[in-house]
Design a protein with these regions (language model features):
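Nucleic-acid endonuclease domains
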Residues: 1-65, 74-258
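Conserved active-site neighborhood of enzyme catalytic/cofactor-binding cores
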Residues: 70
Length: 258
């Protein structure tokens, strides 16, 4: 095993081997066979799971790295107009979240039995390993570069908002109104539709005979932007500390020679 699946730091540091690299740069031509189907959705995420981390894609209720309680999410960035004078690092660099981050399918029959204190979503997704890559038009998937990779968990303040959002969504299920759920209801945690079409992807709900569109818990795109900013600030700090460490060592050597 190239990393310790029980150790968060080991998982994070192994993931960060892809930072500023593409899969082709990391593997060479070894994985060409995995990218033949150009229309397959989620291909990059699947290859990261199966080839890079070495576990099979699944829909388990547990986190991807269950022994470390970490869920993996591979997500795209998009290029935006650079704003050099912006106070936001992501705007200075010219990147933004391309889409929401989908967390898990909502099982209306099961979620109606839950409370916030015992909810299955946070058991699975309390801490995320986020791997953001820059999505570029006409660039092969294996050549897309990873720009941000790190562990992330919501702050206490954000968690309060997420709890409120969760209750808004789940209360509609408990009231037999799952078909009325809308992403506009909430701030950070959303409930996006999932499936080929809303009509074909319907699920039963416990307190109504009306079938509701299949939905998934997700982190809303605007909130993902704030997560990206947080990770960029942390990355900036990491680089500063590394530079500071190297600078201090150079000074030590210089003084020793003096």
């Amino acid at each position: 095993m190239k990393y310790n699946s029980k150790d968060k730091d080991s998982i994070r540091e192994y993931a960060r081997k892809l930072l500023n690299s593409s899969l082709r740069e990391f593997y060479g031509q070894e994985l060409t066979h995995r990218f033949n189907n150009r229309k397959a959705k989620g291909r990059l995420g699947q290859v990261i799971e199966e080839e890079f981390f070495g576990y099979k894609v699944n829909s388990n209720k547990e986190a991807d790295f269950k022994e470390a309680s970490i869920e993996l999410k591979v997500a795209p960035l998009k290029a935006i107009k650079v704003k050099e004078k912006s106070s936001l690092l992501r705007e200075q660099k010219g990147i933004s979240a391309k889409e929401r981050i989908v967390l898990s399918i909502i099982d209306y029959m099961e979620v109606a039995k839950e409370t916030w204190d015992n909810n299955s979503l946070m058991k699975k997704c309390r801490e995320l390993l986020l791997m953001f890559y820059l999505n570029e038009k006409d660039v092969a998937v294996e050549d897309l570069k990873f720009e941000l990779i790190n562990l992330w968990t919501p702050s206490d303040e954000d968690m309060k908002v997420i709890e409120q959002d969760w209750n808004i969504i789940v209360n509609k299920v408990k009231e037999g109104r799952a078909e009325e759920i809308s992403e506009g209801d909430t701030l950070y945690l959303g409930a996006c539709t999932k499936g080929s079409t809303a009509d074909k992807s319907k699920r039963k709900q416990p307190f109504s005979d009306v079938e509701a569109p299949q939905r998934a818990f997700c982190l809303k795109r605007s909130y993902v932007d704030s997560i990206i900013e947080e990770l960029m600030v942390r990355e900036s700090y990491i680089h500063h500390e590394k530079y500071k460490s190297v600078s201090d060592k150079i000074k030590e050597v210089s003084f020793d020679k003096a």
